[in-house]
Design a protein with these regions (language model features):
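Glycan-recognition and catalytic cores of secretory/periplasmic carbohydrate-active enzymes
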Residues: 1-446
């Protein structure tokens, strides 16, 4: 166990901060979904209602429902309804990426011109929302799960490649000639959630209804972790339709929110966490995959630490080149959140008799071993969040400048609570199950 978690006051602080996030985000609820929030936690009506935000909120409030938090079940039910009734395309199937706040004269949701495209990123989050809804027993979550499963099977999952296609035109007639690691990363998370959702319904782990989701997660993970290992644990993120690296992709748009140029530090940390979760599931259910996941997760974690204070200021830079030189030096809250999750997950792997092995520990940690290392970094990351990111309970700055002052540019406002909430909850939960199922079976939040 991480040293900090042996202190009751720290566990209480984590839970109080998580509950404050659930309270802060309540104003996001709008008739057709969940709105993007501004820096004061008010709906930003200059932004459309976006699927990824509505899905993340549905996922988080499903967890809140399992925690017994007042009003969270109603929020999750609203999210499931909005995804089915507002975001689902009644003409071509699939789910819109973004819709207008105002419906048409007949009361139907209207996609924005850009938001009518069908993207793997948005569909991964629909699967996440449906899975958490199933685990939490949210009304109509089964309907949403069946709908999104069918769309992924028919259009997004590319069996020969063992990964997700990126995006399609509204009618699924045109497939984008690009493949991306970001959408596939969130697809891994969603597949792990879907696997656990099936288990929560009593489906056996080796039943195809459950097993296919874990197999898909392992397929994507195997590719990305092998790729990372061959590039000094800095992950190329952009590919053509044949999965050949596009090294110069977005060289002229280095601060892109979802497809930035270079290596994204926070994604390395997120992949490390997901690899640990998949490893635990594989081991528990006898799946012959992922024998190198612990090694690669640790490699990603250690390489990312080279960017901690990497430009002389506290915190993680956003992106680097493939030699580790910072490109975009602004600090994103989600990167720090994923560093917390990675430290927690690696500690869980190490404590579960699946040690990451002799991987060249920093000399300072030899005396205490890996557990000491993860405890040290966990406390460093929590201290940074408390000092720089948490404006007040429930209010996390989403972007800081190079001097760690609140800033905007890449991200404006405080759009959602997904990364911060998970970072606060993961330390409190048993390691192994996906976060929503872990809450369901845990007494840590009672």
């Amino acid at each position: 166990m991480l040293n900090a978690l042996q202190r009751p006051q720290h566990r209480e602080w984590l839970l109080e901060q998580a509950e404050a996030l659930l309270e802060f985000a309540r104003k996001a609820r709008q008739p057709l979904g969940f709105a993007y929030l501004d820096k004061n936690g008010e709906p930003d009506f200059g932004q459309p209602i976006q699927a990824w935000i509505s899905c993340r909120m549905t996922h988080i409030y499903s967890i809140g429902a399992l925690m017994g938090m007042e009003g969270c079940r109603e929020m999750a039910e609203h999210g499931i309804r909005s995804l089915l009734d507002s975001f689902q395309d009644p003409q071509h199937g699939g789910f819109f990426e973004a819709i207008n706040h105002q419906p048409d004269a007949a009361g139907h949701a209207v996609p924005t011109p850009e938001g009518e495209r069908k993207t793997a990123y948005a569909h991964a989050f629909v699967l996440l929302a449906a899975s958490s809804g199933l685990i939490a027993g949210i009304e109509r979550a089964d309907e949403l799960f069946n709908a999104i499963s069918g769309v992924i099977d028919r259009h997004f999952w590319e069996e020969g490649a063992g990964k997700m296609r990126e995006s399609f035109s509204r009618d699924f007639g045109e497939c984008e000639a690009y493949r991306g690691v970001n959408a596939n990363m969130h697809s891994v998370e969603a597949c792990l959630a879907a696997f656990d959702a099936q288990l929560s319904l009593g489906v056996a782990a080796n039943d195809e209804r459950a097993a296919r989701w874990l197999a898909r997660a392992n397929s994507i993970l195997g590719f990305v972790l092998d790729l990372a290992g061959r590039h000094d644990y800095r992950i190329p993120e952009h590919f053509d339709a044949h999965w050949q690296v596009l090294w110069d992709y977005n060289e002229n748009d280095k601060t892109h929110q979802f497809r930035p140029y270079g290596a994204t530090v926070g994604h390395a940390l997120e992949w490390a966490r997901l690899a640990c979760h998949a490893l635990a599931m594989n081991q528990k259910y006898g799946v012959d995959a992922g024998e190198h996941y612990a090694r690669d997760a640790y490699g990603l974690f250690r390489q990312s630490l080279g960017n901690w204070h990497g430009d002389g200021a506290a915190g993680f830079v956003y992106t680097t080149d493939f030699q580790g030189v910072p490109i975009v030096r602004e600090r994103m809250h989600w990167v720090l959140c994923e560093s917390i999750g990675a430290a927690v997950a690696l500690d869980g792997v190490n404590a579960a008799d699946a040690p990451v092995g002799d991987l060249g520990l920093a000399e300072a940690y030899v005396a205490t071993g890996l557990g000491g290392e993860f405890s040290y970094w966990y406390e460093q990351f929590i201290a940074y969040a408390d000092r720089y990111l948490i404006e007040a309970p429930g209010r996390w700055h989403h972007q800081l400048d190079t001097e760690n002052l609140p800033a905007e540019g890449i991200w404006a406002g405080k759009p959602d609570i997904y990364h911060a909430f998970q970072a606060l909850m993961l330390p409190l939960l048993p390691f192994g199950p996906f976060i929503t199922r872990a809450v369901k079976i845990s007494s840590a939040v009672d």
